[in-house]
Amino acid sequence: MELANTLRQDGESRGGVLAHLERLETQVSKSRKKLEEPQNAQALEARIHELKRLRDKLRAEVKQRQARVKASTANVEPDQILEISEQEILERKQENMKAILQAYRFTGISGKLTSRGVCVCISTAFEGNLLDSYFVDLVMEKPLWIHHHSVPVFIPLEEISAKYLQTNTRHFLFVLWEYLNAYSGRKYQADRLQSDFAAFLVGPLQRNSLCNLLSFTYKVKPEGQSFPFCARLLYKDLTTTLPTDVTVTSQGTEALPSTWEEQRAAHENLFFTKPLHQVFTSFAKKGEKLDMSLVS
């Protein structure tokens, strides 16, 4: 009886110890979790604090930059800003003009910079002979405009300027050079005809200011006979030195012999394809001697 009681007491004692140990382990686990929770919270709080600090720093830098920009433009009026941008545009145009003059220096177009822009010189030539030169004084403003020039009044300068000066200065100069160079070439031919072949003309050479309409009477002496021809040359294209329309007729109402008609047609073709002075030179080379009886 006593042994049974002892065993029961021992069992209860061991069971109580084990239960107590389990309770202690549970309490320790709960205590550890409670200790870890504040540590995690502290870490999160530190991270949040660091992010806020970085945010405030970035905001401060942005405000400083905005303040510097505002300070730099505080004393600049809108008109001044516009003037600055226009000045930059004009400077770029000036640089472009330098490049254009450099590219055209071998074509007869040259120039120099002035206090207000650039003065362009357009030199003309024909068959290797240097002829007249003209100038155009351009003012580099917005819009670009011509201050002075020596272009003849019968050259359509205003029309050319209206088309190209504001949009394509390079093309404006090229087109103007074409007109001036062709005019000088036509004038050179007419002058040569009058100076070198005046003795072979019947009456004066008639021409207009542009030298794009010429009419004259000349003689050749085929087969010992003298017969005058009347020539009319029209240059519809003012940028060319050869006529677009040529008419050669006989003077009088008499019908031409067949040989003279052939010569008349051949002369028309020559006037279409050669400068005036070269046409008369070719007559001599082919044995078509001009009527020397007209020389006085």
Swiss-Prot record:
Annotated coiled-coil segments of the chain: 17-105
Subcellular location: Nucleus; Chromosome, Centromere; Chromosome, Centromere, Kinetochore
CDD domains xrefs: DRWD-C_CENP-O, DRWD-N_CENP-O
Keywords: Centromere, Chromosome, Coiled coil, Kinetochore, Nucleus
GO BP of this protein: centromere complex assembly
Domain of life, source organism: Eukaryota
A cellular component term, taken from the record's GO annotations: nucleus
Main location per the UniProt record: nucleus
Matches recorded under Pfam families: CENP-O
Family named by the database record: Belongs to the CENP-O/MCM21 family.
Subunit structure: Component of the CENPA-CAD complex, composed of CENPI, CENPK, CENPL, CENPO, CENPP, CENPQ, CENPR and CENPS. The CENPA-CAD complex interacts with the CENPA-NAC complex, at least composed of CENPA, CENPC, CENPH, CENPM, CENPN, CENPT and CENPU.
Function: Component of the CENPA-CAD (nucleosome distal) complex, a complex recruited to centromeres which is involved in assembly of kinetochore proteins, mitotic progression and chromosome segregation. May be involved in incorporation of newly synthesized CENPA into centromeres via its interaction with the CENPA-NAC complex. Modulates the kinetochore-bound levels of NDC80 complex.
Protein name (Swiss-Prot/TrEMBL): Centromere protein O
Species for this entry: Bos taurus (Bovine)
